[in-house]
From Swiss-Prot:
Disulfide bond annotation, renumbered to this chain: none
DNA-binding region residue numbers: 28-51
Keywords: 2Fe-2S, DNA-binding, Iron, Iron-sulfur, Metal-binding, Repressor, Transcription, Transcription regulation
Protein name from the UniProt record: HTH-type transcriptional repressor NsrR
Organism of provenance: Yersinia enterocolitica serotype O:8 / biotype 1B (strain NCTC 13174 / 8081)
A GO molecular-function annotation: double-stranded DNA binding
């Protein structure tokens, strides 16, 4: 299963925010600069992350973005569930004439659930704690 770039950059943005001291604000511009992604694309991602409570956005002169809850409470599987379209195949009867008898969708759904269950074993904190090489790459001191 390949994650969409939307989910990929969502995870990267969260990783960046998790690498900052807890509660510290950053900006969308800073995140886009670190990862070299379009600002418009990142705005959409941050808006979605904010809607589901994973990011807090504060407007104004001293505003910015930060994690919506502690990194050790944000499971990677939950992030993927919020950002990723998880349907692997189009099983509508208009698209596939074997849909009424097909068992593949159930197998694929079980595989996706196993994938997500594995991701649930890890939090953002697991991705950043004691990860000096990551801090150096992100220019976080």
């Amino acid at each position: 299963m390949q994650l969409t770039s939307f989910t990929d950059y969502g995870l990267r943005a969260l990783t960046y925010m998790a690498s900052l001291p807890e509660g510290q604000m950053t900006s969308i511009s800073q995140v886009t600069e670190v990862y070299g992604v379009s600002r418009n694309h990142m705005v959409k991602i941050i808006n979605q992350l904010s809607r589901v409570g994973l990011v807090t956005a504060v407007r104004g002169k001293n505003g910015g973005i930060r994690l919506g809850k502690p990194a050790d409470q944000i499971r990677i599987g939950d992030v993927v569930r919020q950002l990723e379209p998880l349907s692997l195949v189009n099983c509508s009867s208009d698209f596939c004439h074997i849909t009424p008898a097909c068992r593949l969708k159930q197998v694929l759904n079980q595989a996706v659930q196993s994938f997500l269950n594995e991701l649930d074993n890890y939090t953002l904190a697991d991705m950043v704690q004691d990860n000096t090489p990551l801090y150096k790459l992100l220019f976080v001191e």
